[in-house]
Amino acid sequence: LKEIKRLAENNEITPCSEYGSISFEDTQPAYIAHLLGYVDRESLSKLKIVCNAGNGGAGPTINAIEQMLPFEFIKVHHEADGTFPNGVPNPLLVENRGPTIEAIHSSGADLGIAWDGDFDRCFFFDENGRFIEGYYIVGLLAQSFLEAEPGGKIVHDPRLTWNTIEIAQEFSGQAIQ
């Protein structure tokens, strides 16, 4: 990257002799199959779940997976809109949790899930609308993965250490920051 930066700063970019191409692939079916591969759908209970997509990328995947699970989804800020008319889609910020909490209370949902705008992080709320800190979720996931694959490696955010490290040790796994 430093070399690219140097070339750009010195205007030393040489034209290429052959241009690349762009292709569009529908990766959603493979992604959904991957997600469902972690779940025994036959053992799932009917739940009412608030899903706050934050007007970001989560909505289309929620729509696609909806018929494959025995859940009722209460959709909040569901339509993708890059102008984010309902505010910054970051449920980690306390000030952005209100719509999810309100939907849990008004619908009697069993839990809530809110995603960030680019759909790479999700955050959970209990049936009372209380935010569940990420280290508890990472711990539950680590335990589940290590029960399925003892001695496995758990890659985690360095901000979420204590619980993950303890669980990895308990299940003979390796916590990697």
Where are the regions a protein language model picked out?
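Solvent-exposed alpha-helices and their adjacent loops that cap or buttress functional pockets
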Residues: 39-45, 102-107, 116, 124, ...
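Short gly/pro/ser/thr-enriched loop/turn and capping motifs at secondary-structure boundaries
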Residues: 80-84, 121, 139-140, 162
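Proline/glycine-rich low-complexity loops and linkers
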Residues: 2-33, 37-39, 128-177
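Short acidic, glycine/serine/threonine-rich loops at helix termini
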Residues: 60-64, 85-88, 122-127, 164-170
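Glycine-rich phosphate-binding loop
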Residues: 104-126, 131, 173-177
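Gly/Ser/Thr-rich loops at beta-strand to alpha-helix junctions
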Residues: 55-59, 119-120, 160-162
